[in-house]
């Protein structure tokens, strides 16, 4: 029995990490599939293989609570590691969905004449009975994208296990859009950042109404089918409103594709799916929060005194797509750290600063 247990635990290491005759550490090149991703070896792309293998050992030892990690360098997938068998499958990407909603907003703006300064009230004539006073009528599409609507909303300050979290109250409501837009105002639109998944849902409904098709149809025709994405589900409420704040499920490789799409200015396999202008605009600070753009987060990593700017998609529990253009890096993490979302980010950030960036700059 002891021998069988040792074989089970050692085989993953032997599969992905080996040594040549001169004791050089070798990472196995990720599998080349027909999904549009091109693979290469870490060594061929100039990364420090020994440092990356040390990182993998640390994760396998349980120090970072990571389910999977994928790294692309110079547009090549050079590392693909799964630390749970289930992590190879479809992952609920949580609020990473918001960044995909941002991409669809860009398509609606560039191709369907959606205007950022359009008041939200214009899209919902059936909700004219709501109280639109106290500047609520001034909320625009731009305010939705920057999480600065001014609507009263308590989400990030409470655990998602707390029944009083407005995100949970939203899920219990019969009409998501009316529940969100019926909230009273707590500040002027554009003045205060307040994380609100409801705004992403309202944004998704606006995109659907502006393009005269469902978010599901738009995402498949404009993005997913062109990127060979294994689209599984996008949850909706009973009336058909899409959960564009956190309802998508992807394979980790499909998450990586989305990061590569943005790193390449909206181009995937030679086709311009998003305008370069929108990619730049949506990943640059636009509102009152220095760390937030249009449904993308912003971060700086400092390694050996050098600062590397990045933008990233962040989903509850440790789902990340991180793009560091200066180093031509795209990094994907999946995890299940739902009890402490900030710890999940800290774990991933430590891997980036201690291993991934150093391995890429040597």
Language model region names:
Residues 88, 156-246:
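Catalytic-site signature segments of enzymes, centered on catalytic residues
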Residues 280-330:
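Active-site Gly/Thr loop motif
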Residues 14-36:
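Bacterial Sec-dependent N-terminal signal peptides
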Residues 199-206, 246-267, 319-335:
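Active-site-proximal alpha-helical segments within enzyme catalytic domains
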Residues 315-362:
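Structured C-terminal helix/loop/strand segments within mature extracytoplasmic catalytic/sensor domains
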Residues 111-151, 182-184, 211-246, 250:
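Active-site helix/loop module of the DD-peptidase/beta-lactamase fold
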Residues 75, 92-117, 144, 203-207, ...:
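Active-site SXXK
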Residues 55-86, 321-322, 328-332:
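A short, well-structured edge-of-sheet supersecondary motif
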């Amino acid at each position: 029995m002891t021998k069988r247990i040792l074989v089970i635990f050692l085989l993953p290491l032997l599969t992905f990490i080996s040594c040549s005759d001169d004791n050089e550490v070798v990472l196995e090149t990720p599998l080349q599939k027909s999904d549009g991703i091109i693979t290469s070896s870490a060594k061929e792309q100039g990364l420090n293989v020994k440092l990356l293998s040390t990182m993998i050992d640390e994760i396998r030892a349980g120090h970072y609570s990571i389910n999977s990690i994928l790294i692309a360098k110079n547009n090549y997938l050079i590392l693909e590691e799964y630390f749970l068998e289930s992590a190879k499958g479809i992952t609920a990407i949580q609020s990473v969905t918001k960044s995909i909603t941002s991409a669809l907003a860009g398509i609606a703006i560039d191709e369907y004449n959606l205007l950022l300064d359009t008041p939200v009230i214009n899209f919902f004539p059936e909700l004219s009975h709501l109280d639109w006073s106290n500047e609520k009528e001034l909320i625009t599409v731009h305010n939705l994208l920057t999480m600065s609507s001014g609507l009263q909303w308590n989400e990030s300050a409470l655990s998602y296990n707390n029944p009083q979290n407005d995100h949970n109250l939203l899920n219990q409501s019969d009409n998501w859009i009316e529940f969100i837009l019926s909230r009273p105002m707590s500040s002027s639109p554009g003045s205060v950042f307040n994380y609100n998944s409801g705004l992403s849902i309202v944004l998704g409904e606006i995109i659907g109404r502006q393009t005269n098709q469902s978010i599901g149809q738009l995402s498949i025709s404009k993005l997913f089918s062109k990127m060979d994405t294994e689209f599984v589900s996008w949850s909706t409420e009973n009336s058909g409103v899409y959960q564009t704040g956190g309802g998508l499920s992807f394979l980790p490789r499909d998450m990586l594709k989305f990061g590569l799409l943005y790193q390449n200015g909206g181009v995937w396999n030679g086709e311009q799916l998003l305008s370069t202008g929108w990619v730049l605009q949506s990943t640059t600070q636009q509102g009152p929060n220095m760390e937030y753009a249009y449904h993308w987060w912003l971060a700086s990593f400092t390694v050996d005194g050098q600062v590397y700017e990045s933008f990233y998609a962040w989903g509850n529990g440790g789902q990340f797509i991180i793009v560091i253009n200066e180093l031509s890096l795209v990094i994907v993490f999946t995890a299940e750290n739902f009890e402490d979302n900030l710890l999940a980010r800290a774990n991933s950030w430590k891997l980036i600063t201690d291993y991934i960036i150093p391995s890429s700059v040597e």
